[in-house]
Swiss-Prot record:
Keywords: Cell wall biogenesis/degradation, Glycoprotein, Membrane, Transmembrane, Transmembrane helix. Pfam families: DUP. It comes from Saccharomyces cerevisiae (strain ATCC 204508 / S288c). It is found in: Membrane. Belongs to the DUP/COS family. It comes from the Eukaryota. GO terms for cellular component: cytosol; membrane. The chain crosses the membrane at residues 51-71, 98-118. InterPro entries: DUP/COS (IPR001142). Glycans are attached at residue 45. This is Protein ECM34. The keyword Acetylation does not apply. GO terms for biological process: cell wall organization. May be involved in cell wall organization and biogenesis.
Length: 170
């Protein structure tokens, strides 16, 4: 039975290698003009950006509805005291509240996404380096050698503060 199992594993491994080698996939090069255009593409295609955009639009609509865009302005009510012919300058923030809110929301969104992408890029470089180390050590197919690799990776990630605990792989 063990002979049959090892033959099946060899056949599956050979089949996987043949499929991978026969695909001859070529990676696209120079898709983006610069790292900034790549960054914008990544940010726009994330769900967090869409959520922030919807929140910004909701906030802007709510701000305009409650400040009286469709009817009387709250400053025109009798609650403010006697009305004068002299109108006060409402100030930059009041006049351009929509633009200010949109700019602040986009700045927060882009900075948050930039932080997350920086963290992922750093984490990706560490994983690439560790993958090279795995290839150099060439673990066999038994679980004991892979448990050693996982334990080394756990301690490596914990020591470099890439993970909060020593138990990324349990």
């Amino acid at each position: 039975m063990e002979g049959r199992k090892s033959e099946d594993e060899k056949n599956e491994a050979a089949l996987a290698c043949d499929v991978f080698e026969s695909s001859n996939a070529k990676l696209p090069k120079n898709v983006f003009r610069s790292s900034f255009t790549w960054y914008c593409y990544e940010v726009i295609n994330r769900s967090a950006f869409h959520i922030w955009l919807l929140l910004c639009l909701t906030l802007i609509v709510g701000w305009k509805v409650f400040s009286g865009i469709g009817g009387r302005r709250p400053s025109d009510s009798n609650m403010d005291g006697p009305q004068t012919k002299h109108k006060r300058n409402p100030g930059f923030l009041r006049r351009h509240s929509t633009i200010v809110i949109l700019v602040i929301s986009l700045a927060v969104s882009f900075s948050w996404e930039a932080f997350k992408m920086y963290r992922e890029r750093t984490f990706g470089k560490q994983i690439t380096q560790f993958a090279k180390e795995i290839i150099k050590s060439a673990p066999s197919t038994d679980m004991e050698s892979w448990d050693r690799v996982a334990a080394d990776f756990n301690s490596y990630m914990y020591e470099n503060k890439l993970w909060n605990t020593e138990y990324f792989f349990c």
